[in-house]
Structures are given as structure tokens and as C-alpha cells.
Amino acid sequence: MAETAASRTGSVSRKTNETSISVSVNLDGTGKSKISTGVGFFDHMLDQLSRHSLIDMEIESQGDLHIDDHHTVEDTGIAIGQAISKALGDRRGITRYASIDLAMDETMTKAAVDLSGRPFLVWNVAFSAPKIGTFDTELVREFFQALAQNAGITLHILNHYGANNHHIAETCFKAVARALRTATEIDPRQVGRVPSTKGTLV
């Protein structure tokens, strides 16, 4: 009888005095998403993250938006990272590494990931304005810092060039999504093995 593949899903509920967040992910999904954070631009970016990684995501965030968007964005990154880490389990069989240069109109951004269990963010992205609409551009970095730290991944993001700040932010999310899509995939030649000479990635 054929062996049934284990479900690679993860769910997290996180409540603080600042935010209340629930996240569910399915690494073997089709990029379906149901997202509500109260921050329109952020919802748009998270939809790109789900769509292009093919990770199904359900995200419900309620935060102190009367102050600003910071806590909602950062804490959502924390919860998504924790859910992805749960879904990865002991990380046996995964491809582990991936990188991509992603183009969008005049903008080009590179993302490289290592699902190593060692959290680290290298961020080389500059925006020419402090806001995209009402969204603080500095929060793009805050999101990816929280994601990398809590997913246990090494993440490098480099914007090669670009003029439109919306495009720069969007290519960051899309490039990370495409890199995650490849890195989280099961390598058929690696099934059941941890892709590390150490024997563990957690």
C-alpha cells in the first residue's frame, strides 16, 4: 500500500494587548487566501505572498490601528512565521534552498532563502518615500524580519533597482513567495532525509 504523505499544515493563534491574530497555512496548497488585517495595502501584499508561493493562507488580524499599523504588521509576520515553521515540521525531504530574481515593470528584486532553522534577515532595499499611500514603507522590513525570525529561515532580499515604491514592495513579497515555493517543496530524491550533514534543521 502506498504511504500517505503527512499533512504539511500549521495554525497559530496569538493574542497580546496590542493584537489578536489567527493564521493557518498549507504548504501544499494552490495559493488560495482569505486575508483580513484591516490594512489594505498589507492585505494586498499578503495575497501576493500566498498566490505566488502556492501556500494556502487564512489570516485574521485585529490590532491597535488607531495608533498605527506597526503592531499589526509585525505580529502578523510573527504568526505567519510560526505557522510555516509548524507546517515544515522537522523539515525532512524539503528542497531547503532557493533564490530568484523577480522583475515587475521597471523593478528587479532578488530573494534567497535557506530553510535552515537559523533565523537571519539580510535587507538591502531602499524606498524613496516614507509611505505608499498611508502604509509606512519601513514596515516592509519589519514584516520580513518577523517572518524570518519565527519561521527559522535565513532570508536575503536585495532590490537591484526600481523607481516605483509600490513595485519595489510588491517585488519583495513576490520574490520571497517564489523562493519559498521552491524551498518548501519536497525533493523526491530527498524524501525522508534531512537536507543537512548535521542531521537536523531544528
Swiss-Prot record:
UniProt key word Lyase: yes
GO cellular component, one term: cytoplasm
PROSITE patterns cross-referenced by the UniProt entry: IGP_DEHYDRATASE_1, IGP_DEHYDRATASE_2
Catalytic activity: D-erythro-1-(imidazol-4-yl)glycerol 3-phosphate = 3-(imidazol-4-yl)-2-oxopropyl phosphate + H2O
Disulfide topology: none
Record localization: Cytoplasm
Enzyme class: lyase
Key words of the record: Amino-acid biosynthesis, Cytoplasm, Histidine biosynthesis, Lyase
InterPro entries noted in UniProt: IGPD_sf, ImidazoleglycerolP_deHydtase, ImidazoleglycerP_deHydtase_CS, Ribosomal_Su5_D2-typ_SF
EC number: 4.2.1.19
Statement: the UniProt record of this protein carries the keyword Amino-acid biosynthesis: yes
Top-rank taxon, per record: Bacteria
Pathway membership, UniProt: Amino-acid biosynthesis; L-histidine biosynthesis; L-histidine from 5-phospho-alpha-D-ribose 1-diphosphate: step 6/9
GO process annotations (BP): L-histidine biosynthetic process
HAMAP family with a match to the protein in the record: HisB
NCBIfam families: PRK00951.1-5 (NF002109), PRK00951.2-1 (NF002111), PRK00951.2-4 (NF002114)
Name of the featured protein: Imidazoleglycerol-phosphate dehydratase
